[in-house]
Every structure is written in structure tokens, then in C-alpha cells.
């Protein structure tokens, strides 16, 4: 279908292609039908002059709808400027902050998400795992580039959340398997090393990784003591970083060997940076867990805070509950408005006809197969480093939300500072920060800033 959108005051004419690309075995037997939506700017005859970006979300089990209708595509879900949903009926508007003026885009729904399905549902589990997912999405990218004659185009990947795990490994996979060298990888709310965010006995790392985001959250809700509360967000986060990588990390490592005086000192400092009480920090042995923190910070106000975006709050319905019962930043209305809009958009504007339900976020992919990393944490950082070393021109842009308690900023910074990227290549990594959460682009201020940052990065 043919369309037009105005971006930065310029009319952009484009072609939208929505459909399935069939993955096959070498003998031609069908393996899966992968659904995608592609946008190609009209008037460009030489593909070498026009970038091509492949986009996907995470989960595992998520379709590509969030990046598609939230930030990148030529149409976006209309929301309040603060990122909250409007009442139904939900609707789309032209996205004047779309990236279509910078790059053609292909939104991929991995097998079992969106309208993508395995050829034989009994074999769908063959696609539901870390390695299987990289292989199938990689095969889609290779096939699309070949079928649509885009091998000479500058090529990029953009993933969000688990999609950053996929994108990091995929960059290495595309190079090693197909000789496809990318120009860039964009990681939105990154998780490359799962040890940084899995709260488990014997793993003290996440407590330090989450502390700066705890501090940002407490600052936002005015739960910090003075004079810290009067300082800027960036200054508060930096003080929390310094404490987390110094005294706090040392205290966590010493464990039960800490003296009573040191415990009291660290308790006071953790309290001062998190907004929690002395007694609560003491009860946690200096280790507040994310799901408890969300329930505890504003308990006296009767509020639970969001994990995906800690600016959001909701009522605590079980006052004695130790853990958050639900995430107010992942409210059903957000999923509902995106689900409504993608179904309406595909059928009415892109003329897609199917009897299949569009799986926005499905549990059908679980249990996800991590058998490649039994008895260890999944860590794709070495694969991204390998891609960068093999391809010294590969650039990486990491977008972070200050209020993201799902993939906290310091965990990402820690991961990149422990990747052993050669000094000559470190300039290829760009970090940007936004005053919002996991899907930072839902906040209009961040949506606008992301587009400005994208214009600089794609230059």
C-alpha cells in the first residue's frame, strides 16, 4: 500500500509491505511463516544510499508492536504526553517523529508472536530458545535482504529489552554465518549479561546494579532526605553509582564478615540513597530486592511503584503483601491500546486479511530454552564484542531510561565496562539517557529527544 507522512516539515512518500516470509529447509520444506511490516521510502533508486533497519522487541514472546507503533514507524499510538493512555477508543496518528526520513524499516515478529507461526505447531518449540531464535531471525534477515535486493544498503538492527540480547548475538551471527556486516546496532533498554539483573542467592551483583535506579526513583517521588533531594537527577544517580561501585560493592562481597559498625554505616547510606527505612534495610541484610522495593518505597502512602517505569504508581490492594502484586507501569490499558491499534492498523490501513489472532505478548514461547547456558547466566556481551572487533566500523547506540527497574542503567554501564572492548573501538559506543522507563519513548519528551539523537547517530 502507498502512503505519505510529514516529518520535520517534509512530506515523505513511502510504500508499506505487510505479509509473511516463509522460512524453509534446504529441501524446500516449509519451517515457518514469519510476519513482517516493512516501510520503504519512495524515490530512492540506489539501495546503497538508503539505510535499512530491522526492528524487534523482546519478551521473549513479544511482537514488534512497541517499537513499531511507539517510536519508529510512520504511525504511532496517541497517548498523553506523560505516557499514560487516553480513554478508549484508542487511535493512531501520523508520527512526525518517525525515523522513516533516516532509514527504511522492517518490523519482525519472531515465530509464535504477531501473525508468525511455525509450519507445524507441534514443532513450534523448535523456535523457542536463545539459539533457535537467533538462527530463525537471522535467516529472516538474510532472506529479506536477498529477496528485496538490499545487500548493498547500510544495515542496522534495533532491539528492545530481550530484543537487545537478540540483536547483540545476531550481529555476530550475521557476520559469521552469512558474511553480512552491519553498520550499527541500537539497544533500547539493554540486557546483555543476565547476571546483572537476576536476584538469586549467591549473586550480589544486582543489588549494586539496581541502586542508582533506586536512587533515581526515590528522587522522583521526593522520598530522599535533604540535601540530596534538592540536587539534580544526574547528580543523585552519580552519587549512587560511586557508592555502588565502592563501599556498597565491598560490603556485599564481605557478607557476614562485616562488623556491626560497618553494617550500621552502610545501612544509613543505603537508606539515604533509596528512600527505605533503617529497619527495612537492616531486615534485607543490605540487599533490597526489586519486587520488594517497588512495594516498600511508598508503602506509607498506600502506593506501589512501577517496575517498567518507576514514575508510575498504583494503589496497594494487599497492605501486608511483601511483593508487588502488579506493575502499575505495565497496566493492561497500555497493552490494550497497542493491541487495539495494531489490529485496526493492519486490517484497515495495510489491508491484512487473516483469521489468526495477533499475539502482542504471548506465553506460548515458554518455557524458553536456555540449555546453551545451563548452570551459568546468559551473557551475549562477548558476542557483541566479537562483532565489533571483527567489524571495526560497527557502531553501537544504547538508549537508557533513568526510571527503568527492569533493565537498570548501571547494569548496562557495568556490562559495557566489562566487555574488554579494545580502546580504539570504545568511541563506537554511544550511551544516551532519558527521564522515563523501559519504554522511554512513551514519554513525549523522550520520544522527541530519541529522534534528535537518531538524526545525529545516523549521520
Question: What is each PLM-predicted segment?
Answer:
Residues 435-446:
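Catalytic histidine-centered segment of alpha/beta-hydrolase-like enzymes
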Residues 251-406:
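Alpha/beta-hydrolase fold catalytic core
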Residues 405-428:
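Active-site-adjacent alpha-helix of alpha/beta-hydrolase-fold enzymes
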Residues 74-78, 175-273:
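A catalytic-pocket lid/entrance helix-loop region that shapes and gates access to the active site
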Amino acid at each position: 500500500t502507498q502512503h505519505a507522512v510529514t516529518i520535520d516539515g517534509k512530506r515523505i512518500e513511502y510504500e508499506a509491505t505487510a505479509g509473511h516470509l516463509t522460512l524453509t529447509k534446504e529441501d524446500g520444506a516449509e519451517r515457518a511463516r514469519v510476519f513482517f511490516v516493512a516501510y520503504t521510502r519512495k524515490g530512492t533508486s540506489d539501495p546503497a544510499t538508503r539505510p535499512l533497519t530491522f526492528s524487534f522487541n523482546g519478551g521473549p514472546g513479544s511482537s514488534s508492536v512497541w517499537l513499531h507503533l511507539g517510536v519508529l514507524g510512520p504511525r504511532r499510538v496517541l497517548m498523553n504526553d506523560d505516557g499514560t493512555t487516553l480513554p478508549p477508543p484508542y487511535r493512531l496518528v501520523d508520527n512526525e517523529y518517525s525515523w522513516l526520513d533516516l532509514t527504511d524499516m522492517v518490523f519482525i515478529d519472531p515465530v509464535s508472536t504477531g501473525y508468525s507461526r511455525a509450519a507445524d505447531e507441534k514443532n513450534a518449540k523448535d523456535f523457542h530458545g536463545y539459539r533457535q531464535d537467533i538462527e530463525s531471525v537471522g535467516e529472516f534477515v538474510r532472506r529479506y535482504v536477498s529477496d528485496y535486493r538490499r545487500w548493498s544498503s547500510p544495515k542496522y538492527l534495533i532491539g528492545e529489552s530481550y530484543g537487545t540480547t537478540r540483536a547483540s548475538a545476531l550481529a555476530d551471527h550475521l557476520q559469521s554465518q552469512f558474511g553480512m556486516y552491519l553498520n550499527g546496532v541500537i539497544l533500547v533498554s539493554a540486557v546483555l549479561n543476565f547476571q546483572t539483573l537476576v536476584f538469586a542467592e549467591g549473586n550480589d551483583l544486582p543489588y549494586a546494579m539496581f541502586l542508582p535506579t533506586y536512587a533515581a526513583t526515590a528522587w522522583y517521588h521526593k522520598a530522599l532526605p535533604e540535601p540530596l533531594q534538592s540536587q539534580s537527577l544526574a547528580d543523585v544517580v552519580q552519587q549512587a553509582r560511586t557508592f555502588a561501585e565502592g563501599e556498597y560493592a565491598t560490603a556485599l562481597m564481605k557478607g557476614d564478615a562485616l562488623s556491626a559498625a560497618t553494617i550500621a554505616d552502610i545501612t544509613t547510606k543505603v537508606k539515604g540513597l533509596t528512600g527505605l527505612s533503617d529497619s527495612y534495610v537492616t531486615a534485607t541484610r543490605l540487599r533490597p530486592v526489586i519486587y520488594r522495593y517497588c512495594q516498600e518505597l511508598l508503602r506509607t502512602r498506600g502506593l506501589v511503584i512501577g517496575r517498567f517505569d518507576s514514575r508510575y504508581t498504583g494503589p496497594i490492594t494487599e497492605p501486608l503483601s511483601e511483593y508487588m502484586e502488579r506493575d502499575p507501569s505495565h497496566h493492561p490499558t497500555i497493552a490494550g491500546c497497542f493491541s487495539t491499534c495494531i489490529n485496526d492498523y493492519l486490517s484497515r490501513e495495510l489491508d491484512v486479511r487473516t483469521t489468526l489472532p495477533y499475539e502482542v505478548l504471548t506465553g506460548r514461547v515458554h518455557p524458553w530454552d536456555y540449555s546453551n547456558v545451563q548452570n551459568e547466566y546468559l551473557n551475549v556481551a562477548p558476542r557483541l564484542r566479537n562483532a565489533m572487533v571483527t567489524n571495526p566500523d560497527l557502531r553501537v547506540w544504547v538508549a537508557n531510561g533513568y526510571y527503568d527497574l527492569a533493565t537498570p542503567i548501571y547494569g548496562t554501564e557495568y556490562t559495557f565496562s566489562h566487555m574488554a572492548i579494545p580502546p580504539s573501538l570504545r568511541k563506537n559506543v554511544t550511551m544516551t539517557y532519558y527521564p522515563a522507563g523501559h519504554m522511554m519513548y512513551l514519554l513525549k519528551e523522550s520520544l522527541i529527544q530519541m529522534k534528535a539523537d537518531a538524526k545525529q547517530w545516523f549521520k
